[in-house]
Curated annotation (Swiss-Prot):
This is Uncharacterized protein y4oL. It comes from the Bacteria. It comes from Sinorhizobium fredii (strain NBRC 101917 / NGR234). Keywords: Plasmid.
Length: 88
C-alpha cells in the first residue's frame, strides 16, 4: 500500500460518517473489499484504464447467472447514493 493509503482511507471514512461518501469510491470498496478497493482508488486513473484496455474481453452475459442478492445490493447502493432511500 502506498503512503497515501491511510489518507485515502481516512477521507473515505469521514465521508461515510458524514453521509457524503462518493458512490464510485464506496462501490470500489464494496466490490473489491477494503484492501484491494483502496489499492484501486490509489492507483493512477490512466494506468487502470490501460490495464482494462489491454486485458482480453470475454462475453460474460451468457456465462454468469444473475445473482438476485447482488443485484438487490447494487440497487440499494445506487438509490442510497442518489436519493437516500432504499429498496426493501
Amino acid at each position: 500500500m502506498s503512503e497515501n493509503g491511510k489518507d485515502v482511507y481516512e477521507a473515505l471514512r469521514a465521508d461515510v460518517i458524514c453521509g457524503t461518501a462518493c458512490a464510485r469510491r464506496m462501490g470500489a470498496i464494496v466490490f473489491h473489499g477494503l484492501w484491494r478497493g483502496l489499492a484501486v482508488l490509489i492507483a493512477p486513473h490512466q494506468s487502470a484504464i490501460a490495464r482494462q484496455q489491454s486485458a482480453p474481453r470475454f462475453k460474460t452475459t451468457s456465462m454468469v447467472a444473475h445473482d438476485r442478492q447482488l443485484v438487490h445490493m447494487l440497487a440499494n447502493m445506487v438509490l442510497a447514493a442518489e436519493t437516500g432511500s432504499h429498496v426493501y
